[in-house]
Amino acid sequence: MTLNEAIKDKTYEIVEIANCDEALKKRFLSFGIHEGVQCTLLHSSMKKATLSIKINRIQVALRSHEAQYLIIKESAQE
């Protein structure tokens, strides 16, 4: 499932960054977003146009078209 399908206040692990261009991948890395990292959906706007996630105690805002590239799974750590 993608980050767009995440449920608020649940913790997920990013398992893959799929099919995005190199510039977006570098942007993700600058935010600390990479495979294996834990993230929590804090808030989403109406229709999930934008998402606010927590990664390593940092809050990051993403657009839905960016979040679609982040493949996640539910984390064993809650």
Swiss-Prot record:
UniProt cross-references to Pfam families, sorted A to Z: FeoA
Alphabetized UniProt keyword annotations: Ion transport, Iron, Iron transport, Transport
TM regions (residue ranges): none
GO terms, molecular function: transition metal ion binding
Gene Ontology biological process terms in this record: iron ion transport
Listed InterPro entries: Fe-transptr_FeoA-like, FeoA_core_dom, Transcriptional_repressor_C
Entry-linked SUPFAM superfamilies: C-terminal domain of transcriptional repressors
Top-rank taxon, per record: Bacteria
Sequence similarity: Belongs to the FeoA family.
Purpose: Might be involved in Fe(2+) ion uptake.
Protein name as annotated: Putative Fe(2+) transport protein A
Organism: Helicobacter pylori (strain J99 / ATCC 700824) (Campylobacter pylori J99)
Source taxonomy: Bacteria, Pseudomonadati, Campylobacterota, Epsilonproteobacteria, Campylobacterales
